[in-house]
């Protein structure tokens, strides 16, 4: 069970920030006491920015949040081992499924069994890490099959920790069964963690006979900070509005009482009316789903998650956000959590 002290980190997306910006904020976050830095797979791949971050920071743990399983297992395992070597084993491979429409329309990948595919994906990658020229790897899973895979360079660190992004109960149970940690997605509530996340993670652990003592609970968390609390809360509405359009967040939104606004947001999204989407997001949604307000307020809001998670990964809103706003908020969230 997580303790009462929260580690914090920052996740960088490919939106509204140049690579130079990301490196500047990475150094700023390290100086401020951040424990980890993470990269998404939006606009850029998830690994290259992390390699750059590792080269300009001194001791930061870095991780993908997340790389999707649309990439062939071989490409992911080699990238992960290279990152582990570069960081002296201070890298986390965060994996996720991505929305079904993205897999089908962007990757040409039809995934009708995401949990089975993720199980195969993790097991296959771990087995590939044990391979060599003289010890070829075979993997015969339900979805993924590999035959005679030769690892031309022995893995410098063949036990890279794998964390899974999970929202639904089946994926949460798989995470507890086979992963080293959880990367909860960025719309969540304390109720969701206590009533959905922990029971299902523990069910997966029981299935595998694990005690879970080394398991890390992480969550991406939307964070908007401004001396003007209304401006911060309005900025956070951008991400709430966008992610409320994705059906797999129903498990978070509906029990929290947000089924009605969610449906209206989706109708506005279908009509291409972004201003209407933002207006539909209620004050209660902002209170429950994100960290938003002044620096003092967001630090107090973060304390609600003590005992529920180990690591808070701060995510600056990006959807329909101007570049200047995005840059200012990255600096503000880092300064708000500075030691």
State the predicted function of each range.
Residues 1-339:
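Active-site-adjacent structural elements that line small-molecule/cofactor binding pockets in enzymes
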């Amino acid at each position: 069970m997580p303790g009462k002290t929260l580690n914090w980190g920052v996740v960088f997306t490919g939106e509204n920030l140049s690579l130079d910006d990301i490196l500047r904020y990475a150094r700023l976050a390290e100086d401020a006491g951040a424990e980890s830095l993470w990269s998404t797979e939006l606009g850029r791949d998830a690994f290259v920015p992390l390699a750059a971050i590792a080269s300009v920071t001194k001791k930061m743990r870095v991780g993908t949040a997340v790389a999707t399983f649309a990439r062939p297992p071989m490409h992911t395992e080699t990238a992960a081992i290279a990152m582990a070597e570069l960081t002296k084993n201070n890298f986390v491979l965060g994996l996720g499924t991505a929305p079904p429409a993205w897999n089908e329309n962007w990757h040409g990948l039809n995934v009708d069994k995401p949990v089975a595919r993720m199980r195969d994906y993790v097991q296959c990658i771990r087995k590939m890490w044990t391979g060599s020229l003289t010890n070829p790897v075979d993997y015969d899973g339900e979805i993924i099959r590999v035959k005679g895979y030769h690892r031309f360079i022995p893995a410098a660190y063949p036990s890279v920790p794998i964390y899974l992004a999970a929202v639904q109960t089946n994926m949460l149970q798989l995470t507890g069964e086979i992963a080293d940690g959880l990367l909860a997605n960025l719309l969540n509530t304390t109720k969701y963690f206590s009533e959905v996340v922990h029971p299902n993670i523990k069910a997966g652990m029981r299935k595998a006979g694990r005690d879970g003592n080394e398991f890390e609970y992480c969550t991406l968390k939307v964070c908007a900070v401004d001396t003007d609390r209304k401006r911060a809360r309005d900025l956070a509405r951008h991400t709430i509005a966008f992610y409320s359009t994705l059906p797999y967040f129903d498990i978070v939104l509906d029990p929290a009482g947000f089924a009605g606004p969610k449906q209206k947001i989706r109708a506005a999204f279908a009509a291409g009316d972004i201003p209407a989407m933002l207006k539909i997001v209620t004050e209660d949604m902002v209170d429950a789903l994100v960290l938003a307000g002044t620096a003092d307020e967001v630090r107090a809001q973060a304390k609600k998650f003590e005992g529920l998670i180990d690591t808070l990964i701060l995510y600056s809103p990006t959807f329909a956000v101007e570049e200047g706003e995005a840059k200012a908020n990255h600096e503000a969230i880092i300064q708000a959590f500075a030691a």
